[in-house]
Amino acid sequence: MESSAGPMELVAALLRGLTPRAEQLLQLSSGGGEAAAGGAAEARAAVATVAAALLGCAFLVLWRRVSAGRKRKREEAERSAAAVAGVGKGGKNASAAAGEEAGGADGRKRVTVFFGTQTGTAEGFAKALAEEAKSRYDKAIFKVVDLDEYAMEDEEYEERLKKEKISLFFVATYGDGEPTDNAARFYKWFTEGNERGVWLNDFQYAIFGLGNRQYEHFNKVAKVVDELLVEQGGKRLVPVGLGDDDQCIEDDFNAWKETLWPELDQLLRDENDVSTGTTYTAAIPEYRVEFVKPDEAAHLERNFSLANGYAVHDAQHPCRANVAVRRELHTPASDRSCTHLEFDIAGTGLTYETGDHVGVYTENCLEVVEEAERLLGYSPEAFFTIHADKEDGTPLGGGSLAPPFPSPITVRNALARYADLLNSPKKSALVALATYASDSTEADRLRFLASPAGKDEYAQWVVASQRSLLEVMAEFPSAKPPLGVFFAAVAPRLQPRYYSISSSPSMAPTRIHVTCALVHEKTPAGRVHKGVCSTWIKNAIPSEETKDCSWAPVFVRQSNFKLPADPSVPVIMIGPGTGLAPFRGFLQERLSQKQSGAELGRSVFFFGCRNSKMDFIYEDELNTFLEEGALSELVLAFSREGPTKEYVQHKMSQKASEIWDMISQGGYIYVCGDAKGMARDVHRVLHTIVQEQGSLDSSKAESFVKSLQTEGRYLRDVW
């Protein structure tokens, strides 16, 4: 069978067919009279035809690349799910299994394990539970499924869920009570479908949530999904697990898991099965690592320099962007640092909207990487390849391993780009280290810290003291795991850092601006902690200084933190410190709107910092926005200048009447900054303003504020 012609072949054929005729037409048009006019017209038509063909083929290429990317991502998810479910070659894939009713022809009950993850923890728990469940229930099939990959189109969610009988959900809450990126589409579909009624009569489920109790909307996503599942007919097997990452979320997961087993026993064991089962011991995950000679690897090493060929850029397919500008925003009098950085995205295909976030992948600094090399005992220049399968193609770890990073790669580059070395290690990492500790005393100590008996000591010595992975490894120098174990079980994958974009494409279409405060603080254990990304940003070399500039893999994450569609609507912005970032973009956008003739509504910006002479960032720009009319009023709070500390929430109280008037006129309220302190205080003050200025009791004031959030008029970009 002949292969079909590709888009470029079609264009080539079209050009070949038109070229001879085009030459004739050009000859005719160079003459005079009607023949020349007719020739010119036909020549223009020919050119238009070619242009249309080229444009059509360009769209076709783009569509194919996007479709191929989605298909590839779907196939990867299916392979992973099939591996965990025990489906081998010739078996049904995950999507086919997802559509089957429980208790198919093979008589095996099926359990679907969904996850929505931002950093990989929820996915790790989902896969760990599925692996353990396989050992407990040999007559059941467990499928692990990415919520985003479960359905390619929104309408498929309901169709597929109707066929599920037993499902487990691992969902994290991110940001201001929001779902993770890969759960966002499902969450939006599920929470906005208010007309479904009761339709999950045969659906049994359990949910484990991942959150942080320090944040206002602790495990909101898990709680909302649970509430809606019950309303729509689902039967809850066990209470929602509320994992708290502020303490030890692994302990929370294990405790919840123990409540789940008795319920699954009732559903998945035969009546005649009276076995209690053996104690399950999880295998230590390990990638297959092969060291290769430098001359064999040099021409094969893949890196992000080739990453700009993707049709769509996301966390899995970032875009290489050079640093164009870097400058310090604090004055020399300040003992802290804040950097203004600009990524050059010209020609990359990357675009953004005002209010979006940029994800930045950076590297561990050299001194940290060198310490890791010393502790592991590997040569920094050694090349290796890393694989999630055996040499025969069989998945390792039952398919529970995350896809490895690109290789061949040197030990130094792998540690710099992909290993999270500075966060505190999880208990599972301590178990892995204990397995490879040659000193039995060290091994016993590591196992104790990871055990239920060592819970309090782990909480104090590791979590409360903020000991990093490298600090813990330094305390147990005999623990030298192989690279395959280190990257699979000890060091989590280094995650991108997200920043509110501090520019508007109306003013900077080919630049993404970032405003970043340097993280440089002493931990309780005495170590000076340097933020991975903020340190890189502070030391970045811009292209305005040298052609050999710094660069990073970046991508844009869309946000709902947007200005009102109608520029005449009043706007209240609250953002101390680097919380100013998105509002700088807002004000650039409003200035552009004004310059285009739009009538702007009143806008007030509450900004706070320590001292006007030290950390009043973008002061000149803010004054320009005032002068040009993009900003109506700038309200300043300096916490270290007067005899008493003043913060933005205090200034809000002083402007209570004005704020209420703007809200009453349909105004929007935006808050950006620290979620644990400032955003909570601002929320309380807003509640008080609504209650007092609106003459409402406390419960009605709370309902009013919630209605502002529901209507999208009270938005927060907090961390």
Curated annotation (Swiss-Prot):
* Primary location group: endoplasmic reticulum
The main enzyme category here is oxidoreductase
Q: Which reaction does it catalyse?
A: 2 oxidized [cytochrome P450] + NADPH = 2 reduced [cytochrome P450] + NADP(+) + H(+)
The residues covered by the Flavodoxin-like domain are 111-261
Biological role: This enzyme is required for electron transfer from NADP to cytochrome P450 in microsomes. It can also provide electron transfer to heme oxygenase and cytochrome B5. Can reduce cytochrome c in vitro.
Q: Which family does it belong to?
A: Belongs to the NADPH--cytochrome P450 reductase family. In the C-terminal section; belongs to the flavoprotein pyridine nucleotide cytochrome reductase family.
Q: What is this protein called?
A: NADPH--cytochrome P450 reductase 2
Q: Which organism is it from?
A: Oryza sativa subsp. japonica
Gene symbol? CPR2
